A protein has these predicted regions:
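Non-catalytic C-terminal accessory modules of carbohydrate-active enzymes
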Residues: 2-152
């Protein structure tokens, strides 16, 4: 999670893979518990008593690798910035996601190839300008809100 926030893609990926290492709770042949845990066969994190921290933290880390968002208050106005693929590891150079949430009530669907965003849709619960960073560029875009007629998007 922290490595992803610091935009250290390979370190974040290494920790994520370590989280997914199979562990036997009994200390058997595949026991890795003393080397930093992993994941049990039931997909619980091997860090009792706080297994939920690892489960939710792992998901949050993946989300941070793909999308980071920030808000700042300027002149009584909240401004949002969304950064796409800020910590993308080499192992994930091609992929897609749907429904990743960002601050400000925004939702992101995107596809990427060779580490570059190729398709992007941003949906919003409210209208407004959002700064979006991707592929080495920064753009201010207008997002329309969800409505009864359909979802707002950029």
């Amino acid at each position: 999670n922290l490595w992803a926030r610091l935009k250290k893609a390979e370190q974040a990926y290494h920790i994520y893979r370590k989280l997914l290492t199979y562990v036997e709770p009994s200390g058997g042949k595949f026991s890795n518990y003393q080397h930093g845990g992993g994941t049990y066969a039931n997909l619980f994190d091997a860090h009792p008593p706080f297994q939920i921290d690892g489960n939710f933290g792992g998901v949050a880390g993946v989300c941070e690798m793909l999308v980071q968002s920030h808000s700042i208050l300027q002149f009584d106005n909240l401004q949002f910035t969304i950064e796409l693929l800020p910590a993308l590891p080499e192992a994930w150079k091609d992929g897609s996601v749907k429904g990743l949430c960002a601050r400000g009530g925004y939702e992101i669907d995107m596809t990427w190839k060779d580490g570059q965003v190729t398709e992007l849709q941003i949906y919003g619960k409210r209208s407004g300008k959002v700064t979006v960073r991707y592929n080495g560029k920064e753009r201010k875009v207008n997002v329309t809100p969800y409505s009864d007629q359909g979802q707002g998007k950029y």
